């Protein structure tokens, strides 16, 4: 860890505890700051807050009183999920108090360079692929962020010869000031999180913060097939490395003659790749680009692609029952992810979909329903998905209250050779704590059919 003195004896407000807030508060105390921790949940229900209080921190729970800002606050470190419309953040901004997220702290203390990966979809798969390729190539990667350990915990132990690989959301990237990844990858962009950002434009600009501090000594890995990403890459001063699944890229990554190429050199045959789905070729090209920029051999990349079958809850194969294959794609929390999942199969599909209503309609899914023989909907968006399915002319459309019921109905509508696919196209928070919980419940329900 770098020697950092900028936080010594400063009053710093950590807003929202959870994993990242707990780690940030603990780190800041270690760096000599006077830490004030604030969380909306009452102290009696907040185990992490009680632990921080026991460490001698000033803990205020049960709301976000504006009076906290009267304590000569030098910096606010916010939980990524707390919107900037929260009154305490609005007031902090008016007082010109800097507001950052935990990844900014991680960068400031890390001896190791960062690889940052963002995009609307594919972040986790690309991050895991990158980590595995670098590990196989003996480039000493450590993984941080939404996967595994919180970034500022990882950064404390990261050495100069290592590289921190981290998945970055728009929520996290809104709170960066000095963060400068050696390699920044921007995978794709489409309309999402409008309840947080307001517009697609603001959402895209938040993502583009990944380029904010890059220089000509850094690299920006950019999806040449996504017009929005290409436009936002104008914010990067780094060396641009493009990747494409549709056209040849001489100075980047592409697919040619059934093989993946990087800067004109064949790296791996498509036939060696075991990860299913056309959309995953984009993720692989991005990860391969990062790995090659860091000196990973073609052999190491090939070894990984021959064994990497995917990430849990992302087109995860569950089991086969009476020649029906079941797949868990609970991470499909938006339409684009579900579109890509539906495009991954040629067999007839029984689709399970539904979840939190964020205000959007689902007509964009209609062109992807060509292999869908039946849909079972659940959650807040069930009526909207039913309308889209009716417009698509599906013969079998059913709505149920719970995911357990949906699994039973989906199996009843399936036949020999079909795929039964959970790909909700919605966030999980109407009925579940996380998309992981939703996926686990789906898997449990499937195994009950056996």
Curated annotation (Swiss-Prot):
Keywords: ATP-binding, Cell cycle, Cell division, Cell shape, Cell wall biogenesis/degradation, Cytoplasm, Ligase, Nucleotide-binding, Peptidoglycan synthesis. Pathway: Cell wall biogenesis; peptidoglycan biosynthesis. One of its GO terms (cellular component) is cytoplasm. The gene is murD. This is UDP-N-acetylmuramoylalanine--D-glutamate ligase. ATP binds at residues 119-125. Its EC number is 6.3.2.9. The keyword Cell cycle applies. It comes from the Bacteria. One of its GO terms (molecular function) is UDP-N-acetylmuramoylalanine-D-glutamate ligase activity. GO terms for biological process: cell division; cell wall organization; peptidoglycan biosynthetic process; regulation of cell shape. Belongs to the MurCDEF family. It catalyses: UDP-N-acetyl-alpha-D-muramoyl-L-alanine + D-glutamate + ATP = UDP-N-acetyl-alpha-D-muramoyl-L-alanyl-D-glutamate + ADP + phosphate + H(+). It is found in: Cytoplasm. Cell wall formation. Catalyzes the addition of glutamate to the nucleotide precursor UDP-N-acetylmuramoyl-L-alanine (UMA).
């Amino acid at each position: 860890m770098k020697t950092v003195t900028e936080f010594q004896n400063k009053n710093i407000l950590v807003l929202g505890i959870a994993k990242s807030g707990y780690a940030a508060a603990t780190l800041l105390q270690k760096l000599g700051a006077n830490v004030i921790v604030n969380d909306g949940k009452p102290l009696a229900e907040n185990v992490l807050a009680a632990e921080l209080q026991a460490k001698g921190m000033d803990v205020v729970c049960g709301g976000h009183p504006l009076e906290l800002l009267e304590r000569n606050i030098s910096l606010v470190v916010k939980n990524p999920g707390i919107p900037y419309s929260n009154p305490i953040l609005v007031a902090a901004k008016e007082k010109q108090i800097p507001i950052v997220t935990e990844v900014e702290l991680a960068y400031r203390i890390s001896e190791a360079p960062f690889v940052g990966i963002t995009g609307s979809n594919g972040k986790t798969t690309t991050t895991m692929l990158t980590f595995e390729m670098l590990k196989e190539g003996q480039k000493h990667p450590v993984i941080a962020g939404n996967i595994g350990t919180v970034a500022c915990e990882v950064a404390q132990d990261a050495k100069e010869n290592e590289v921190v690989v981290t998945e970055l959301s728009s929520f996290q990237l809104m709170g960066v000031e000095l963060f400068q990844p050696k390699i920044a990858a921007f995978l794709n962009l489409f309309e999402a999180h409008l309840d947080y950002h307001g517009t697609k434009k603001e959402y895209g600009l938040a993502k583009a913060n990944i380029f904010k501090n890059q220089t000509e000594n850094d690299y920006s890995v950019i999806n040449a097939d996504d017009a929005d990403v290409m436009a936002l890459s104008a914010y990067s001063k780094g060396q641009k490395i493009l990747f494409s699944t549709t056209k040849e890229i001489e100075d980047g990554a592409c697919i040619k003659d059934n093989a993946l190429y990087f800067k004109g050199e064949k790296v791996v045959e498509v036939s060696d790749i075991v990860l299913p789905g056309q959309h995953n070729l984009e993720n692989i090209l991005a990860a391969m680009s990062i790995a090659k920029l860091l000196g990973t051999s073609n052999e190491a990349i090939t070894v990984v692609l021959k064994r990497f079958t995917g990430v849990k809850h992302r087109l995860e194969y569950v089991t086969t029952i009476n020649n029906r294959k079941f797949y868990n794609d609970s991470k499909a929390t938006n339409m684009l992810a579900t579109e890509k999942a539906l495009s991954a199969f040629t067999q007839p599909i029984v689709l399970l979909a539904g979840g939190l209503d964020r205000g959007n309609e689902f007509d964009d899914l209609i062109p992807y329903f060509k292999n869908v023989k039946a849909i079972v909907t659940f959650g807040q968006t069930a009526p909207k998905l039913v309308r889209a399915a009716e417009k698509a002319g599906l013969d079998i459309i059913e709505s149920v209250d719970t995911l357990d019921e949906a699994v039973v109905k989906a199996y009843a509508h399936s036949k020999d050779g079909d795929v039964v696919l959970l790909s909700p196209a919605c966030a999980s928070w109407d009925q579940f704590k996380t998309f992981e919980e939703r996926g686990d419940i789906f898997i449990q329900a499937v195994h009950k059919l056996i």
